[in-house]
């Protein structure tokens, strides 16, 4: 049963934190085409409509193939600025007040786009967003798991000068790309090095991979947050562990439906995980490719699963509690969330 218009409005206007957003995955077809034209890049699509037609993927790999083709238009600092500024505009419109944004340097350095170009453009846009909108943000550098451990180490070393400068907003590392055949332990030594450097640790696990990958991300990589994690529902002991530890799951329902992790949003495990006491949070993943930014994901999920106002309050609180913000900042945002939801009860 669809939620009421009143609840939909409360959800849309609620403060939120977005913790699972790939900045390259926010590249809309219109901007992709504009950047291709600006940079003289030939795309394998004749029109914006052809790109949108290509969005009928069947699995994670077919999505990734399109994702990396789209990234080929990103060549200059201004390109990264424009992409990031476009994401921020969408996030601000959805009442996202804080975002911890993934970026994939290997996608760009492999194309001979220097690290300073990637980080420089993204950070400049985030600095402008903070000044213009009070938009709070941090960056999480993600390693591509289909590449080698050695490549990840090389990327970490190249990024260290940027990581060590707080002005660049990089607070942690993550692990993304193809799960199949690339278990967490492949990057155990890389994550140990990152932990020694004092970086926050997250990893994609339990999306297309099994519940065991969630366990391995926790035990071997020692992550503080699990990105996706929906296959945890297949292991009752793991669900109990996640609920007890309050290690957050950054769940992306429209992404899961689009990539056939679940055949239909009504089959999604989010409500089961939430009802079991897990620290579930709700995000957009790659919104340009999966058909929705934050509010679209929230509203679609609430309509499909019949979630309540109390669930919305919990999910909004969880998003800030699971963030890597300083405790005093978390407290301010949690208070804002409580005021918003209690005003409507």
Curated annotation (Swiss-Prot):
Gene Ontology molecular function: adenine deaminase activity; zinc ion binding
Cofactor dependence: Zn(2+)
Annotated positions binding Zn(2+): 20, 22, 204, 285
One GO biological process term: adenine catabolic process
Reactions this protein catalyses: adenine + H2O + H(+) = hypoxanthine + NH4(+)
Transport is among the record's keywords: no
Active-site residues annotated for this sequence: 207 (proton donor)
Alphabetical list of Gene3D superfamilies matching this protein: Metal-dependent hydrolases (3.20.20.140)
Cofactor note as given: Binds 1 zinc ion per subunit.
Keyword line: Hydrolase, Metal-binding, Nucleotide metabolism, Zinc
SUPFAM superfamilies named among the record's database cross-references: Metallo-dependent hydrolases
GO cellular component terms listed in the entry, alphabetical order: cytosol
Enzymatic class: hydrolase
Site feature location: Important for catalytic activity: 228
Residues the entry annotates as binding substrate: 286
InterPro entries attached to this UniProt entry: A_deaminase_dom, ADE, Ado/ade_deaminase, Metal_Hydrolase
EC number: 3.5.4.2
Protein family membership: Belongs to the metallo-dependent hydrolases superfamily. Adenosine and AMP deaminases family. Adenine deaminase type 2 subfamily.
Function: Catalyzes the hydrolytic deamination of adenine to hypoxanthine. Plays an important role in the purine salvage pathway and in nitrogen catabolism.
Protein name (Swiss-Prot/TrEMBL): Adenine deaminase
Species classification: Bacteria, Pseudomonadati, Pseudomonadota, Betaproteobacteria, Burkholderiales
């Amino acid at each position: 049963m669809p939620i009421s218009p009143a609840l939909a409005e409360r959800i849309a206007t609620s403060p939120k934190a977005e913790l699972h957003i790939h900045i390259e995955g926010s590249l809309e077809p219109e901007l992709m085409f504009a950047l291709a034209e600006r940079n003289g890049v030939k795309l394998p699509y004749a029109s914006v409509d052809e790109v949108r037609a290509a969005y009928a993927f069947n699995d994670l790999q077919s999505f990734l193939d399109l994702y990396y083709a789209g990234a080929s238009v990103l060549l200059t600092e201004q390109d990264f600025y424009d992409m990031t500024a476009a994401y921020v505009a969408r996030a601000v419109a959805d009442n996202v007040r804080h975002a911890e944004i993934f970026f994939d340097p290997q996608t760009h350095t492999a194309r001979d786009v220097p690290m300073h170009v990637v980080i420089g453009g993204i950070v400049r846009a985030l600095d402008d967003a903070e000044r213009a909108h009070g938009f709070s943000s941090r960056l999480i550098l993600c390693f591509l798991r289909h590449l080698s451990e050695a490549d990840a180490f090389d990327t970490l070393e190249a990024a260290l000068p940027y990581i060590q400068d707080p002005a660049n907003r990089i607070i942690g590392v993550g692990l993304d790309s193809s799960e199949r055949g690339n278990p967490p332990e492949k990057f155990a030594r890389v994550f140990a090095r990152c932990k020694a450097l004092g970086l926050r640790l997250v990893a994609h696990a339990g999306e297309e991979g099994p519940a065991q990958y969630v366990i391995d991300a926790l035990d071997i990589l020692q992550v503080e947050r699990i990105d996706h994690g929906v296959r945890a529902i297949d292991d009752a002991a793991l669900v109990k562990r996640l609920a007890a530890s309050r290690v957050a799951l950054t769940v992306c329902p429209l992404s899961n439906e689009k990539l056939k992790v679940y055949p239909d949003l009504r089959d999604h495990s989010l409500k089961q995980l939430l009802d079991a006491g897990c620290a579930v949070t709700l995000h957009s993943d790659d919104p340009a490719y999966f058909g929705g930014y934050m509010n679209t994901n929230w509203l679609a999920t609430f309509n499909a699963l019949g979630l309540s106002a109390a669930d919305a309050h919990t999910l909004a609180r969880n998003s800030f509690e699971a963030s890597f913000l300083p405790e005093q900042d978390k407290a301010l945002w949690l208070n804002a969330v409580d005021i918003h939801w209690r005003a409507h009860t």
